[in-house]
C-alpha cells in the first residue's frame, strides 16, 4: 500500500533489500553495515532529496547516513519511551506496567530513536478493554507467560492492536 501511495503522489521511491544484501555477503550483517549505508546513500544521491522517510527500514542508521540526509523515522513509542522494534517496545511497556504508549515521527540521529520529534500521538493502554488483561498479568509470572505465549499473549496482542490502529 505504501509503494502505491508513493507512486500515486509521483514521489521517487528507493528500495534496497537488506536481506538480499546480507545473503550476497556471507557473515554477520554488522560486518557490512557501513557498506549497506553507502549503497543506500549512493541510491539516494541521484535524487538530491530534501527529506527521506525510513518507512519499514528496521535497521539502525549509521552516523554518516544521518549526516548525509534528513531522515524521518517512524517509531512505535512516545518520545523518550522505549527504543527498539515494535515487538521490543511492547515487551518493555508490559514489563514497566505502562499506562500509555504512542507513536512518533522523529529525525533519525546517531542516538537511536531519540532524535528531534516532529509529531507524536498518545495511546492509552490501561482501563477499558485493557483492565482485565493487566489484572490477569498481575496474577501470573511475566517471564513464564512470555516464554509460553510469546507475542500471542492477549495483553501483547491488545497493545499491538491499539498501536496499529493509529499507524499510517
PLM ranges: what are they?
Residues 1-168:
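One-carbon transfer enzymes
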Amino acid at each position: 500500500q505504501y509503494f502505491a501511495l508513493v507512486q500515486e503522489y509521483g514521489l521517487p521511491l528507493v528500495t534496497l533489500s537488506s536481506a538480499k544484501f546480507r545473503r550476497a555477503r556471507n557473515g554477520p550483517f554488522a560486518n557490512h553495515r557501513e557498506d549497506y549505508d553507502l549503497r543506500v546513500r549512493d541510491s539516494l544521491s541521484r535524487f538530491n532529496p530534501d527529506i527521506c522517510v525510513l518507512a519499514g527500514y528496521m535497521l539502525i542508521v549509521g552516523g554518516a547516513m544521518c549526516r548525509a540526509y534528513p531522515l524521518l523515522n517512524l517509531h512505535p513509542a512516545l518520545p523518550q519511551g522505549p527504543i527498539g522494534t515494535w515487538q521490543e517496545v511492547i515487551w518493555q511497556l508490559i514489563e514497566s506496567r505502562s499506562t500509555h504508549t504512542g507513536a512518533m515521527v522523529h529525525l533519525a540521529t546517531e542516538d537511536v530513536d531519540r532524535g528531534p520529534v516532529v509529531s507524536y500521538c498518545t495511546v492509552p493502554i490501561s482501563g477499558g478493554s485493557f483492565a482485565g488483561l493487566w489484572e490477569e498479568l498481575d496474577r501470573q509470572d511475566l517471564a513464564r507467560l512470555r516464554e509460553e505465549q510469546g507475542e500471542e499473549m492477549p495483553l501483547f496482542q491488545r497493545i499491538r492492536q491499539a498501536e496499529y490502529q493509529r499507524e499510517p
